[in-house]
């Protein structure tokens, strides 16, 4: 049998083995406990990421749906606004017939005849005018892409080019402020260009349209030039005498548009007086010419456009008052090309007039001194030549006579002194009768008119073919009509107040 000491050792070994197994079991259990929470946390993180992604997707879908709904509402609103604009245009009469403005063939004495060509006619909305006459009209291009599409559809169809031109549409605000005074036409130089989205597409013309004309703008740049009916001689005269951009613009306006056309037109073609629109092609030509000659800015061009509108308003007021619309610089100018009713060209008529020198006689009862109008300077002074055909008579000693011309081209008769050098000085108005003749022979012995202040509004002398014409004047007596040696018929129309007489050629 085993001793007691051996049994104790066996028991200790067994207890030690049991403790060792228990420790291993604890370690395994601890390891299992530590692994299981780790796996659970990983599963929890994966589920949270999935839920966040799904939430973001749902939010994105909701936002897209709302944006689609807003876009649909905006489209409906746009269609509604477009319909309202069309109805408003219909009410305002903007979609009626095209506004047509006759062009001037360069003649200072009248508008273009029926045989001349009208280059460009545009309505008041955004339009396309191309060489083959586009069939569609765009009332309001919404984006730059649509404008580029319009240009691509029109440019390149013919040999001519289409240019984008902004046309002003502002109303004539100053019409309500006009008092009839000429000083009301002063233009403020502090104006700035206004934002204007109205765009007109026009087609530039070519040299074939006006073979005897000239180019406005840079003739070497096809996009910055316009062919106009102004003759090379007139264009040289304009370039020589016009030292500022504004003066050149207003001078070109007189050459391109007759004053009668200016009186019923403006740049926009709008206003309470129902005015027409000046030809945008020629207005663009003036713009190109000023940019080329003077290198002006857009601000300068805006002020010049104001001056052009002001000039048109001045012509309109003068027309309303019945005053002359004659241009001062054109008073002694013969049109270069103008067809007459009987087929005789203006060049032949000009040659006949040159060969037969004419003079207008201003007779101041019983004169012995004769002077002839030679030239009216820019300062308004009249330079005269002695031994001419201006008969001055019955002027009391110490009194004198002069003929002056105002800024609008009106000739006025005053008491003046005629010096030895041919210069005259203004004093006060005399009494006047007027006779026209082709020669300086034959004096005038007649009594004066009853008018105290005579204003010659418009005088144009033509070829004399009838030497038996009569002077028609209500204030002249029959005896006076019999005594006057008249070589050319002139109408003397005396106003109701008996103070103004208008002298005009028959048929003018």
UniProtKB/Swiss-Prot annotation:
GO MF, any single term: DNA binding
Pfam families for the chain: BEN
Polar residues composition-biased segments: 141-153, 180-198, 332-350
Coiled coil: 65-90
Localization per record: Nucleus
Region feature (Disordered): 132-153, 168-198, 326-350
BP terms from Gene Ontology: chromatin organization; regulation of cell cycle process
Domain BEN stretches: 223-319
Keywords of this entry: Cell cycle, Chromatin regulator, Coiled coil, DNA-binding, Nucleus, Repressor, Transcription, Transcription regulation
UniProt keyword annotation of Transcription regulation present: yes
Family that this chain belongs to: Belongs to the BANP/SMAR1 family.
Function: DNA-binding protein which may repress cyclin D1 transcription by recruiting HDAC1 to its promoter, thereby diminishing H3K9ac, H3S10ph and H4K8ac levels. Promotes TP53 activation, which causes cell cycle arrest.
Protein name listed in UniProt: Protein BANP
Organism: Danio rerio
Gene of this entry: banp
């Amino acid at each position: 049998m085993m001793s007691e000491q051996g049994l104790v050792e066996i028991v200790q070994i067994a207890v030690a083995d049991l403790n060792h197994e228990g420790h291993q079991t604890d370690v395994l259990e601890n390891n299992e406990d530590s692994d299981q929470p780790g796996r659970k946390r990983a599963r929890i993180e994966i589920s949270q990421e999935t839920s966040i992604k799904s939430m973001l997707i749902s939010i994105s879908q909701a936002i897209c749906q709302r944006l689609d709904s807003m876009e649909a509402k905006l489209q409906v609103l746009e269609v509604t606004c477009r319909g309202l604009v069309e109805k408003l245009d219909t009410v305002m009469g903007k979609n009626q017939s095209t506004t047509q403005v006759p062009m001037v063939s360069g003649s200072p004495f009248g508008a273009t005849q029926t045989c001349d060509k009208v280059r460009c006619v545009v309505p008041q909305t955004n339009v396309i005018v191309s060489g083959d006459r586009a069939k569609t009209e765009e009332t309001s291009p919404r984006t730059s892409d649509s404008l580029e599409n319009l240009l691509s559809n029109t440019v390149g169809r013919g040999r001519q080019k289409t240019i984008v031109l902004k046309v002003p549409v502002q109303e004539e605000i100053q019409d309500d402020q006009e008092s009839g005074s000429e000083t009301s036409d002063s233009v403020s130089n502090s104006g700035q260009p206004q934002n204007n989205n109205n765009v007109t597409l026009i087609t530039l013309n070519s040299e074939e349209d006006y073979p005897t004309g000239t180019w406005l703008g840079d003739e070497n740049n096809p996009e910055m030039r316009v062919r106009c009916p102004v003759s090379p001689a007139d264009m040289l005269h304009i370039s020589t005498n016009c030292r500022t951009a504004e003066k050149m613009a207003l001078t070109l306006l007189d050459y391109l548009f007759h004053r009668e056309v200016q009186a019923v037109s403006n740049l926009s073609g709008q206003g309470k007086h129902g005015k027409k629109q000046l030809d945008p092609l020629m207005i663009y030509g003036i713009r190109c010419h000023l940019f080329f000659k003077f290198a002006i800015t857009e601000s300068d061009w805006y002020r010049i456009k104001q001056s052009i509108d002001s000039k048109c308003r001045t012509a309109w007021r003068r027309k309303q008052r019945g005053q002359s619309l004659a241009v001062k610089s054109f008073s002694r100018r013969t049109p270069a090309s103008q067809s007459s009713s009987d087929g005789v060209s203006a060049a032949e008529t000009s040659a006949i007039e040159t060969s037969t020198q004419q003079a207008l006689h201003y007779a101041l009862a019983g004169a012995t001194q004769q002077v002839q109008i030679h030239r009216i300077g820019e300062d308004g002074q009249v330079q005269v030549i002695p031994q001419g055909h201006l008969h001055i008579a019955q002027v009391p000693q110490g009194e004198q006579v002069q003929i002056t011309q105002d800024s609008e081209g009106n000739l006025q008769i005053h008491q003046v002194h005629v010096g030895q050098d041919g210069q005259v000085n203004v004093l006060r108005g005399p009494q006047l009768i007027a006779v026209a003749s082709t020669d300086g022979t034959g004096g005038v012995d007649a009594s004066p008119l009853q008018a105290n202040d005579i204003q010659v509004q418009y005088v144009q002398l033509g070829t004399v073919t009838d030497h038996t014409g009569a002077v028609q004047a209500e204030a002249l007596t029959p005896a006076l009509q019999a005594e006057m040696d008249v070589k050319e018929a002139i109408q003397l129309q005396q106003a109701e107040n008996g103070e103004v007489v208008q002298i005009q050629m028959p048929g003018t």
